[in-house]
Amino acid sequence: MAANGIMEVTDSNFDQDVLKSDTPVLLDFWATWCGPCRALAPIVDELAKDFQGKLKIGKMDVDRNGATPMRYKVTGIPTLLVFKGGQVVEQLVGYKPKEAIAEALKKHVG
């Protein structure tokens, strides 16, 4: 886990860290070459602080992990998926402002 509390999620740890999580998980699908992904990164970092203890936040590099994005039909990045109880409960595709993401997350956390 990174210093900012954000998990690095891979195809191999996805089931354990995301699907079996007791708390909701926001998973950010990104790539190093993706400009909008880089623009979204500081927002995801801020959300990790704002929602600390209420949900987990993870990032998955789509260039290093192909199975999970294919499984969830992630065709454009950045894509944010919110998982709760092992199911996708929210999907946000493309760059979104912090307020829009926070509103979506509030629907799924205690």
Feature-to-residue mapping (PLM):
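Proteins that catalyze or organize thiol-disulfide redox chemistry
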Residues: 1-26, 31-56, 64-110
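Conserved residues in the N-terminal Rossmann fold of short-chain dehydrogenase/reductase
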Residues: 59
